[in-house]
Amino acid sequence: MAQEITHPTIVDGWFREISDTMWPGQAMTLKVEKVLHHEKSKYQDVLIFKSTTYGNVLVLDNVIQATERDEFAYQEMIAHLALNSHPNPKKVLVIGGGDGGVLREVVKHDSVEEAWLCDIDEAVIRLSKEYLPEMAASYSHPKVKTHIGDGFQFLRDYQNTFDVIITDSSDPEGPAETLFQKEYFQLLNSALTEKGVITTQAESMWIHLPIIKDLKKACSEVFPVAEYSFVTIPTYPTGTIGFMVCSKDKTCNVKKPLREISDEKEAELYRYYNKKIHEASFVLPTWAAKELN
């Protein structure tokens, strides 16, 4: 009989997401039906469990990255905010995002000819194919190319190459901390074509305003257009997470989609994103707007 898999974050059948640095004094808990997999990869602790209400859950270094029930909200927004702010995206790069969810959204755009993914940890890709098949299905798409390695080096090797670059990073602790700094945005800028657009994960305005202010400042020093937007998603801390959306084209209004499709086509392609949500996601509550604008 196979031995039951245990993990220190799971106590009395409940997974607890606790961080004294990123969200002190609060925690997300999910009831665990079964632990599916646990390993320590070369870079991080990888846990996958089946929850009673949110399907399979991917956890990296004790932090929820995706659940089958709500992942589409984040993946759709981080991808389509960028892709629909570019007039004709042909070559797209995803940094991180080894679960494949962002790639799945990228290849929905007919204009895209190449969709690259660069992730440092092969374990996330391998395990997502096994346990998150709806997210990872895009790895078999003919437009998709995968590179296992360091995002910084990849960007240095591909100057002036990509129309859109999407950074699907974890929180700014440990290896991901450098993805929130000015040097990284300068590398992104250099790897973009003339009217290039980026989106990057940008934390929750409810608990991370100082981080977001620094992030917006770093982006604004590199890109002429740098705006903050957000999405609601129940299994991320505070139920919201934000994005920086930036363009090299100073005339670009990232707050309105450049290319629109019919309502019927939207309903067919997306479960969260639509043209109205695109615009609304940049409208911030009064207190947050005061801090960030």
UniProtKB/Swiss-Prot annotation:
GO MF term list: spermidine synthase activity
Gene designation: SPE3
Pfam family membership, one: Spermine_synt_N
Entry similarity comment: Belongs to the spermidine/spermine synthase family.
Uppermost EC category: transferase
Organism whose genome encodes this protein: Saccharomyces cerevisiae (strain ATCC 204508 / S288c) (Baker's yeast)
The protein's name: Spermidine synthase SPE3
Residue ranges constituting the PABS domain according to the UniProt record: 12-248
NCBIfam families hit by this protein: PRK00811.1 (NF002010), speE (TIGR00417)
The enzyme's E.C. designation: 2.5.1.16
Chain ranges passing through the membrane: none
Gene Ontology CC terms, in alphabetical order: cytoplasm; cytosol; nucleus
